[in-house]
């Protein structure tokens, strides 16, 4: 397995992309790049600066002054905003419910995609998001599109919130996830959609281990070529 490939994992909100991508990256000793965390960090920075997130010009000013870095912690990946650890605060419902608005702006996405492509230049990466296979890494050797029902995804996010000590309402989460799906798939710039050459993986009734196993067997097939 000397070959260093790029693996793109796309899918809607709370489909389990990040969880699976982290495990796959660890199994392969690859770098994991969480593009969702990059948009979350930008959203957090904009909210902290009380910027109008519907205003692209104001957001671009934030983007220009934001340095986002990843570091491997003991059991998880840490996210830093201008040197400050923001790994936890970017996961609050406040940020979660606004990240799709920030991500819809053309200039914002163009700059973020440029940064993401920069991080992936040398290969040996697992990257997850909404438009990785279609836009960020169109030449990735492995492309996965993960799906799960709104109900299943809301349940997962609900448990995640409770485990982190956040208030959580399951019915409200179902509505919010459906709304994020709508925003992500209908936006003009790089909408959420399956790449033509991506393999679709419905994770509704699968465990994390089963999903990882399926992806690893796809990767093994690529290495065998």
UniProtKB/Swiss-Prot annotation:
GO biological process, one term: nucleobase-containing small molecule interconversion
Residues involved in ATP binding: 11-19
Pfam families (alphabetical): Cytidylate_kin
Segments crossing the lipid bilayer: none
UniProt main location, coarse: cytoplasm
Keyword field contains NADP: no
Keyword NADP assigned: no
Reactions catalysed, as given in the entry: CMP + ATP = CDP + ADP; dCMP + ATP = dCDP + ADP
Keyword terms of this UniProt record: ATP-binding, Cytoplasm, Kinase, Nucleotide-binding, Transferase
InterPro entries found in the cross-reference section: Cytidylate_kin, Cytidylate_kinase_dom, P-loop_NTPase
Classification via Gene3D superfamilies: P-loop containing nucleotide triphosphate hydrolases (3.40.50.300)
GO cellular component terms, semicolon-separated: cytosol
UniProt EC number: 2.7.4.25
Subcellular location: Cytoplasm
GO-annotated molecular function: ATP binding; CMP kinase activity; dCMP kinase activity
PANTHER family xrefs: CYTIDYLATE KINASE, CYTIDYLATE KINASE/PANTOATE-BETA-ALANINE LIGASE
Similarity comment: Belongs to the cytidylate kinase family. Type 1 subfamily.
Protein name: Cytidylate kinase
Gene: cmk
